[in-house]
Structures are given as C-alpha cells and as structure tokens.
Amino acid sequence: MSSSQKKAGGKAGKPTKRSQNYAALRKAQLPKPPALKVPVVKPTNTILPQTGCVWQSLGTPLSLSSFNGLGVRFLYSFLKDFAGPRILEEDLIYRMVFSITPSYAGTFCLTDDVTTEDGRAVAHGNPMQEFPHGAFHANEKFGFELVFTAPTHAGMQNQNFKHSYAVALCLDFDAQPEGSKNPSYRFNEVWVERKAFPRAGPLRSLITVGLLDEADDLDRH
C-alpha cells in the first residue's frame, strides 16, 4: 500500500483542503436568488393591508425645512406600466400612505396648484382636484399618514397603456409655536397599494419615485 493510499485511508470520511476549496468554488458559481429589498422596520399599525401592497423606501429619509416659516411642499409621483388583455382603467385602484415625521404637530393640507415645467398640471395632465380629498391619520410611531385613492377615467381601455400619477402635498405650519425655529419634517417611506380585478388579467408594474429637491421648488408660495 502506497503512502498516499495509507494517508487517504487514515483520514477516511474527512474532506481534504483541496475538496473543500473545490466545494466552495462550486458553491460560489451557483446562481444566487434575487435579493429582496426589505425595509428594516415595517409599520405594524398601518391602515393598509399587507396583501397587495408594495413598500417603497427612499433609503435615507429626506429632510425638508421651511425657509419662510409657512410650510414646505414636495411632489411624489409614480408611473404605472401595465400590460394585459383589455385592461380597464376603472378596474385599477391605487392607495398611498405617506409616513411623515414633522418637527411638531402642524396642519397638513393638499395642494392643487402644482404644475410641471412646461406648465401642464400634473396627475393625468388634468387638475389635481381630480384626486379625492386625502384623509390624514395620526400614527404614533410614524408621524402622520395620508391615505387616498387615485381615480381613473371610466371608459378608457387599451391593451397596453402608461400613465403617470402625481400627488402634491403641503405641510402647513399654521400651528407653529411662537418663538420656535423654522419647522421641518422627515419624509420616511411610502406604502403603495395596487389592486386590479380578475378580469384585468396578468399585470406587470413599475413604480418610480420622484421628489422635488430644490429649495425654490419646496417653498410654499
């Protein structure tokens, strides 16, 4: 019996360093499952159901400050990109929940005068008042939540269609305590609920986040 055979027999059942390296290399070459972007903390008392919702996190919370002491404004928009047989827009229901942490309990309000760079009103190219009034709810852990359902135009149907929705929000500081510093708040995360009735068929979606980040755009006029 050769020395190599004795060595192999003496260490039967024990992997060699070479075999361990080979196994590690083989494991590294295996296809990895897609990484899931799961937020560190999810709200437990949100008014939206878990099913059918997409948790859209902006990563680092966005902090905005008021330069005139009145309030600040931002624009949140998302694009829906669906493909399916004879999708009816009225079959699609959207909800959003904004998690906002203000520096103190101010008054929230919706704005209806936000326009795009070329002067067109946002939200389907129509005035913002097409959106029903949002309902704000206090959230002890996450500040405040705005919930609304984005309406769609009845009768429109296409096999493939793309529409962009946008919501303009204003944080009003009418209740600012006397002598306090310029108010600010942190824009944390957004819940987006997407629903479609069964007849809409299989759907694919793309959600993008757009925020106004220029101080001039955020000032309330």
Swiss-Prot record:
Keyword vocabulary terms for this entry: Acetylation, Capsid protein, Ribonucleoprotein, RNA-binding, T=3 icosahedral capsid protein, Viral nucleoprotein, Virion
Annotated segments matching region Disordered: 1-24
N-acetylserine PTM positions: S2
Main location: virion
GO molecular function: RNA binding
InterPro entries: Coat_Ilarvirus (IPR002681)
Protein's cellular compartments: Virion
Keyword presence, RNA-binding: yes
One Gene Ontology cellular component: ribonucleoprotein complex
Function comment: Capsid protein. Binds to the to the 3' end of the nonpolyadenylated viral RNA and is involved in viral RNA translation initiation. Probably binds RNA and plays a role in packaging.
Family membership noted in the UniProt record: Belongs to the alphamovirus/ilarvirus capsid protein family.
Protein name per its UniProtKB record: Capsid protein
